[in-house]
Amino acid sequence: ITGNTGYHLWFLYTLIMLYIATPLFRLITCHASKRQLEYALVVWIIFSLIAGQINSFAAEFGFDEVLSLYVPFVITGYGGYFLLGHYLTSYPLKGAAKRRCYILAILSACVICGGKWILPMTFKIETAAVEAPLGLFSCLVAGAVFTVSQNISISDTGTRVLPFLGQRTFGIYLTHVFFISLLYHIWHVKPDYCQPVLAIFVSSVGVFAASLFVSWIMSKIPLLRKFV
């Protein structure tokens, strides 16, 4: 999956490593106390998310990775999200902690949107550092979304639909870029074909529906169903 392939396939390497590391994470989650999990998450947030995001911003402004010498090899990368999901499942946020989580998530979303608007205008820099998936702002938003999902009541229909969608997610991940390329690069559909907000919604739903359909078809093929 190297070379001239879909740009989204880089994440397959991460998925493979996460699956390899899953037994180790299971040991941690089965035997660690709440305080130990909190310690691991704090280490991850400081040395992976915050340090990584600072390094990303430094690189965008032409500096070396200013914290490269001070980042120890600890729980890093997407593995921290594994632990965060387990922690929030085992110890759901309540009361003031939940409200603070939502406030920080809203502020983070504002920082992400504001940064994407202000940085190009002020410094002439187009950067993805502000919304980096392994960054503090994205983590706060993800944690809030996870917390919200824990408090949603699901109907009987939803309990049937969600497992079906869950089984199709990997196929959707693999195929959605094909439909994006088909839409914008082969059919040359312009992003401004209608009102921008509506265009984003229509395009997103269309790509998702097409990818879901193809993923479902692939799941019916014996050779492919093992993978999707």
Name the predicted role of every residue range.
Residues I1-V228:
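Alpha-helical transmembrane segments and their immediate juxtamembrane cytosolic regions
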